[in-house]
Amino acid sequence: MPLAQQIAEWRQQKTLILGILGGQGTGKTTLAAILTEILAEMELQVCRLSIDDLYKTYADRLQLQQFDPRYRWRGPPGTHDVSLGLSVLKQLRQVSPQHPVAVPRFDKSLHQGAGDRIVPERLTAADVVLFEGWFLGVRPIDPALFDHAPSPIISESDRTFARDTNDRLQDYLPLWDELDRLIVLNPVDYRLTLQWRKEAEQMMKATGKPGMSDTEIEEFVQYFWRSLHPELFIPPLLSQPEWVDWIIELDENRLPTSIYCPYNPGLD
């Protein structure tokens, strides 16, 4: 896999922190799992970390929700412990048997699906850190863009929420600065993530597990679009080669149609 070989080259004898940005259902977790197996065959030890692992505790998110009811679901900027993430990434650069790192882990099934932290994972080595998330590396944009934002940012309260989450992105920039490289999974149409989420729920329910209805899924996904709309936030990121190293274009079946470097489109 050329991507795994590229990651090995990027490492250069020090711990590499590689970000993977992808919306819901784009396959970022699957990609991280595949890369972990391939890199292991190359004798590289991998630590997988999700932005979800940095969620604030259940108790802290309850307080946030009471203070600001708009944060009814975990996920948007403001629901994570950024200082924890910074500390963990910095420690992972120095990890060794003499300096083990407690990597945070999050269980989404706790508290009737609200989720909470569980016992951290103790690591003593990491050649590569695969850090993935639905808005990893995303930067604040000009607030004026929300004056004529795409659906479902429709009402004035929608625009206010979008501006507020845009402001909160500023708190995440120190975390993004820890990334050595960033890969973006970019679907041909961001609205495909809604379809993919529905498919995932249907598969989960087919195994006997509880899942959301189509209406609930639409409300859930649109909540994320209101907080950080892909049409507003992704194009500016992709246009800046100093922020993105590889872009993987995905078709409607989540299959890659193109893999390229924005600063060297001929490299694939």
Explain the meaning of each model-derived region.
Residues 31, 35:
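Hydrophobic positions on the alpha1 helix immediately C-terminal to the Walker A/P-loop
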Residues 28:
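Conserved lysine of the Walker
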Residues 1-19, 23:
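Extreme N-terminal, non-catalytic leader segments
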Residues 47-50, 54-110:
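Conserved nucleotide-sensing/catalytic segment adjacent to the nucleotide-binding pocket
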Residues 37-47:
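Post-Walker A helix-loop "phosphate-sensing" segment adjacent to the P-loop in P-loop NTPases
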Residues 13-14, 123-125, 177-178:
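Short loop/turn elements that form and flank the Walker-type P-loop nucleotide-binding site
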Residues 90-138:
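Phosphate-binding/switch loop-helix module in NTP-utilizing enzymes
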